[in-house]
């Protein structure tokens, strides 16, 4: 490819504080192992007036997952080496148990354990300890799809990997990372700090320019799924290590970034802690990271030997910034979608009975819709009277049915329009035997509220909103991890006499949790 258009790239970077508003951040572009651009702005701590620099360490959150998998490959070998240990770990399982490779590729079908902490009564700013993580993960008995058939993001996959690695090697993951990854890659200040409450070198902020920016409180202990703290310079060193070892047939990043498939042979979007994407016909590998108050993203284009890194100490869209930086570096112009006028027949709520997942659509203006299906809203471009798509989802409408496809997830669902009013007779206590947790629903002044209770405590009351007959939505926008589960979908079941017998509770991260009415 021709040389990078540095003025265009620099103009984009210098506009980041205006376009991604927040306390501070740091970004870099690396090409052919050399630094093209390295920039920090703003403050690491607003109250202390401590400036952000390329040496400032920040939590890289889920970007840590690739490093956990790197330790697995480097110290132990192929994932199958730990399959018997995983069988012992998930010894309560009733369904087909996933393999360790399924964990590495987010194809396990296990429900995300941070989402499950909500159902077990955790407070968003509560303390979450290592023994509580194992308590939750080892009680699991089922998956929300057959392992190897679909993709679903699951932090617990990598928490389990960390436990298995430490058990197999007899060493801490922190020591293994320092010796086998950080030292060879010259990541001089990178460190695993599992307790988020202990990190105080930089402050992460919740909020925005409307509500203001407030220091985020995090008191969770995570391992394997996240936990590494690193500076921009550390992350640059990782990209340079990737470039130095690119010709090594057994090079660590070549192994991490190798293509993966689903059980049916379809290409998978994820492997060994890395997300696979494409832009302008070029394959990208990388990962994002999020915790309350923090966002980061890295992308690597092996074909052109280009990497982009974005680190924010606020909840801005680091993924968007990193991809736009990559496109600028590659000389890819912004896409210009063709949009059609929205047909009102799109708008409303749609249910897939098999998964209990609900799709909500509303007009976003300009030939676009706001869709709520996963952990956060998606903006869909309407390309025809009965077709719409985003970067993740394609919708095709046929009367009162929408065919939803998420190619990367190997997921195809028939969504049925919800029509009619919801009955108000859902108050009561419900029990999940698998989680040993309760859902309490109450009616106050004609409004329905719900709370979760389990081994992690008793949650606040959350309002419920009707989506259709026997289908309700319970939004949870703050939880121990980020992003939060979003909307929990509650689908109620009745017997022949019309009495409620139970409810299926789920979200994209954790589907199909069955509760019986007590």
Curated annotation (Swiss-Prot):
Function: Hydrolyzes N-terminal residues in D-amino acid-containing peptides.
Subunit structure, interactors included: Homodimer.
GO MF annotation, one: aminopeptidase activity
Binding-site positions, substrate: 481
Top EC category: hydrolase
Family to which the UniProt record says this protein belongs: Belongs to the peptidase S12 family.
Reaction it catalyzes: Release of an N-terminal D-amino acid from a peptide, Xaa-|-Yaa-, in which Xaa is preferably D-Ala, D-Ser or D-Thr. D-amino acid amides and methyl esters also are hydrolyzed, as is glycine amide
Regulation: Inhibited by beta-lactam compounds such as 6-aminopenicillic acid, 7-aminocephalosporanic acid, benzylpenicillin and ampicillin. Inhibited by p-chloromercuribenzoate.
Keyword terms, alphabetized: Aminopeptidase, Hydrolase, Protease
Record-listed E.C. numbers: 3.4.11.19
Keyword Protease among UniProt keywords: yes
Top-rank taxon, per record: Bacteria
GO biological process: proteolysis
This protein's name: D-aminopeptidase
InterPro entries, per database record: Bact_CellWall_Synth/Modif, Beta-lactam-related, Beta-lactam/transpept-like, D_amino_pept/lipop_sf, DAP, DAP_B_dom
HAMAP family, sorted: D_aminopeptidase (MF_01960)
Region named Important for specificity: 477-487
Active site: 62, 65
